[in-house]
Amino acid sequence: MEAHLADMESSGGPTSSLAGTSRNTHVEDDDVVFIESVQPPICAPAIPNERNFVFASSKHENPPGTDSTISPSWRDLTSQKGNLCETIVIDDEGDTDTNGGEEKNPTDFIEWGPNGNKSSTKNVDFPIASLSRSKTKTAVGPFNPGRIDVTDAFQNGRFAVHHNPDSWISQSASFPRNQKQQGVDSLSPVASLPKQIFQPSNQQPTKPVKVTCANCKKPLQKGQTAYQRKGSAHLFCSTTCLSSFSHKRTRKTRNVMCKKDSPVRTTTIVPPVESSKSLQGFYNASLSPYENCQSLRKEVFTKSRCIICNKLGEVRHEISVNSITHKLCSNNCFNEYRLTNGLIMNCCEQCSKYMPKSTGHSILITGQQKRFCCQNCADEYKEIMEAKSKLLLLQNRKRNAIREENEKRLRESSGTLSGNTGDIPEKKEKSSEIIKVAADCSLDTSSEEQNVNLPCSVAVISDTFKEQLGDKNSEELDMSILPSLDPGSWPRILNMKQREFLVKNNPPQIRNFNFPKDSAGKKFSETYYTRILPNGEKGTRPWLLYSASKDSVFCLYCRLFGEGKNQLRNENGCKDWHHLSHLLSKHDESEMHINNSVKYSKLKSDLENKTNEATEGGEDCVQLLYT
């Protein structure tokens, strides 16, 4: 290799050589350093030539801040006349040719002589198989602005020059990437490096999302009934958690009146010097009418009327049936609504724990089927019911005592009145009428007449009054109060006593009857008494009544409490047998029918409570039926 370089030196006159690597790579670097020669020390021979060296930096240069000395090995630099400019391009990104497992870097040296000389090209191959230099294709190393040692470049696999201690080369200037110096041709633009995309090798499997109750934080099982308040994203496992979680958020409304346009009328309050009130109290006292109006609106929007008790208060439960929302104020109203409409919940009556249909204990309590998850919940529920019944008994006793005192005072006043009247029969009849009216105004006259010993005069007057008016009143009451059980014979408008009579007697459904056919051959069938629920189960229609006198059907709830011109509500009934199935299914889901059913169940429960109070008035113990 030294002989080859010697031939290059003796190839004629002062030359300027360009050393470059010929390769076909996708990555080039355009970081350029311009280096010019400086005067050596006095003891060294002067260098008349001023050279500019251009190095194409590679990614394996020394880090910034390290200085190295470059000494040229050409002997004829001192014999050169004039100032010649030499450009040297060094690049270590050459392609490697593989030949028998050995890598080589072909390097071309191109020499230029003075004007008129032809350029000659010599190919020099340097084997670099034994070198430990590593090449990286994914990134470009930092640019070295310091001095470069040519011998280090040869050791890295490029070229070798003889070190000449008499030559001194220093750095003159450095330029960043993709920048061109005036008067010097820069290298070709560098192709952009391909970006390496890093992808995770192993993606973590997605975990199944657990849905929990917002109140008790218990996980909801698959298939479990979840409760959700309208307008809220929280889910609950039971109605107890739903009602105890939080209050309903305030309704957002649009401001109708702008605060700037509204007249601000404030009352100026000057607190006395000795006042101990805070400034906040005086500030609240001087609110504008607009702010007062806004506070009243918020209070109105947070309250609504319950469909069961008809009270205006906070809504704790909302039930949506066919886009109709029914609002309930408490758990008691919700339970009453559920029992009235036959809603079945798969949860324990005591702890509200979810239970599948095939599990749990079913117990009949006060004529109603209750479900419990375990025997402990059933015992606790029994204790609660017994405590409530004892409380009701005490309240009944208190009311009875008050009623007895009022009747005692009435008897004393009537006794004095009968003593003063003497033998006048007309006054006796008037006094007996007064006593009768007072007895009718009492809550329960039948039970009290057996326990109370009336005076002789009052008893005689009442007996004579009953004997005289007994027959006439009984006939009139039977005609006006007691309608027949056939809904076709009921009057158009029913009074309260007639409604109570029909609710107590519960008109039966006609079965095993030869229903007549109409002109089209259609007739009523007993299958209309049942219906198919959305879950596939069969449900009953206890409100559907057939009238044999008019050959039509009626709705018991809507006939007693309904209003309007519905066919199932009016006095003629419905006899459209061809479309009856569609009419009944539509009537089941109507808002009017649901409201009337609630009224019917409420009246029936009130009547049952009155009868229970009358029967349990003389008993000291509490009796509950458990099977």
UniProtKB/Swiss-Prot annotation:
InterPro entries, per the entry: TRASH_dom (IPR011017), Znf_MYM (IPR010507), ZnF_MYMT-QRICH1 (IPR051284)
Residue ranges for the region (Disordered) are 1-23, 91-123, 405-429
The UniProt entry's GO biological process terms, in alphabetical order, are:
negative regulation of transcription by RNA polymerase II
Q: Molecular function terms in GO for this entry?
A: zinc ion binding
For bias kind Polar residues, which ranges apply?
12-23
Give all cystine bridges in this chain.
Answer: none
* Record key words, sorted: Isopeptide bond, Metal-binding, Nucleus, Repeat, Transcription, Transcription regulation, Ubl conjugation, Zinc, Zinc-finger
Q: Does the keyword Transit peptide apply?
A: no
Q: Does the keyword Transcription regulation apply?
A: yes
Q: Where in the cell is it found?
A: Nucleus
- A Pfam family name for this chain? zf-FCS
Crosslinked positions for Glycyl lysine isopeptide (Lys-Gly) (interchain with G-Cter in SUMO2)?
K59, K137, K195, K408, K427, K517
GO CC entries: nucleus
Which residue spans match zinc fingers labelled MYM-type?
234-268, 280-319, 326-354, 370-396
Subunit composition and interactions: Interacts (via N-terminal 120 amino acid region) with ETV5 (via C-terminal).
State what this protein does: Functions as a transcriptional regulator.
Its protein name is Zinc finger MYM-type protein 5
Q: What lineage is on file?
A: Eukaryota, Metazoa, Chordata, Craniata, Vertebrata
Primary gene name: Zmym5
